[in-house]
């Protein structure tokens, strides 16, 4: 949900750290008014490579009064990608905008039973939150935008159970790749939202040219792509093709 709420570092006020030489320091300030270089942000961004956190002071965010989760499905991946760009261009900032392509849907649906349409080229998960009137208005606008870009259906989760099932599929995506192949190579890249459709089309071309399989599941709202090249490392020569594809994608 970093599209609306920001990444982890935005919610960490201070952190007590043990550095590699054993020194214990506090980075940031619990009252959120530390001066100088943002060493707290650098440490959080280092994802564990700069030391060990022993205490963390975080900023808590109040739960919104209204939350709605939408599921849109498309015949074309480009339609889902273009919908994301159009939603943001319309001034709507959802809490989350996530896309899963058909291979991902086929892998997760048998386990989570979220009701993802197996014949869809892509599904788009949209989460909205805020005041009830604002959420209702955003739902209506997104339905219009999605339909204009080829959405076959726009489904609004009816209750918390349905919301949880829709999200369980997204959160289970990486684990479900074992259904397809035992190994994977992950690219973690960021591109402009306006080029999502173009870049995804090229990713599929690169994979097809090398006779490989890719599964796309990603944070579409901020253009953060995670092309998962899945393969069996026991296959002779496959690693070379995978690495070549990964380099070309990046």
Language-model features: locations:
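FAD-binding subdomain of flavoenzyme oxidoreductases
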Residues: 1-98
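C-terminal substrate-recognition/cap domain of FAD-linked oxidoreductases
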Residues: 58-62, 68, 73-245
């Amino acid at each position: 949900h970093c599209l609306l709420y920001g990444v982890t570092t935005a919610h960490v006020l201070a952190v007590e750290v043990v550095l590699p030489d054993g020194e214990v320091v506090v980075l940031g300030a619990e009252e959120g008014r530390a001066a100088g270089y943002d060493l707290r942000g650098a440490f959080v961004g280092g994802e564990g490579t700069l030391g060990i956190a022993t205490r963390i002071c975080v900023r808590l965010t109040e739960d919104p009064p209204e939350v709605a989760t939408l599921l849109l499905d498309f015949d074309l991946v480009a339609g889902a990608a273009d919908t994301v760009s159009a939603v943001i261009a319309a001034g709507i900032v959802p809490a989350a905008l996530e896309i899963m392509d058909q291979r991902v849907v086929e892998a997760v649906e048998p386990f989570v039973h979220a009701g993802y349409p197996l014949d869809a080229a892509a599904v788009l998960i949209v989460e909205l939150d805020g005041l009830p009137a604002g959420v209702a208005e955003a739902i209506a606008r997104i339905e219009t935008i999605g339909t204009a870009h080829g959405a076959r259906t726009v489904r609004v989760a009816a209750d918390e159970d349905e919301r949880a099932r829709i999200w369980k599929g997204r959160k289970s995506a990486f684990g479900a790749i074992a259904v397809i192949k035992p190994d994977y190579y992950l690219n973690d890249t960021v591109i402009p939202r306006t080029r999502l459709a173009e870049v995804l089309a090229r990713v599929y071309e690169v994979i097809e040219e090398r006779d490989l399989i890719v599964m796309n599941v990603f944070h579409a709202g901020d253009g953060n792509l995670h092309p998962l090249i899945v393969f069996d490392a026991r296959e002779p020569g496959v690693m070379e093709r995978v690495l070549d594809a990964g380099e070309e994608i990046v």
